[in-house]
Amino acid sequence: MAVGPGVKMESGLEDLRGPTVMFSNIFGIGYEGVTFEEFVQTLKNRGATVLVDVRLNPISRKKGFSKTKLSEALGQHGIRYVHLRELGNPKENRDGFWDTYTPAWEAARENYRGMLDSEAAREALAYVEELACVEPAVGLMCFERSECNCHRDVILQRIKQQELALI
């Protein structure tokens, strides 16, 4: 049974809650240690129709993972590619992410959280949320296999915080 504002529930009461926006269809994905074929298969298995590249510079020494090649190849699989440079992590802030659960790791994450407060980053986050409202699944891509070693974890946490603020 559908629920939402103005809809009668089984109890006969009207649901007066506002719309709840849930972004459980946004997930992180890294390409470290996988082939392009494995990467695409993971996207398909997760139902992704859009891949958002959150690398500052969408280039890679790994075959198939630079912006143009990646966009073309994903298109052949029915997956749209979007690069959001505004969500990239500057080179000078990356090393701290590798020292998991240390003061350097916390500092790198805190520094990146501050970057997400910029107007450009807020607009990019809003765009990701808009995509999540109209697409079955949205992948956020960077290099690192482990999310806790990547800034995309901070992005996903920020989206979840914003989602909870709406409820």
Mark where each language-model region is:
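Compositionally biased, low-complexity intrinsically disordered regions
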Residues: A2-G4, L16
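Residues lining hydrophobic/aromatic ligand-binding pockets adjacent to catalytic sites
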Residues: E10-I167
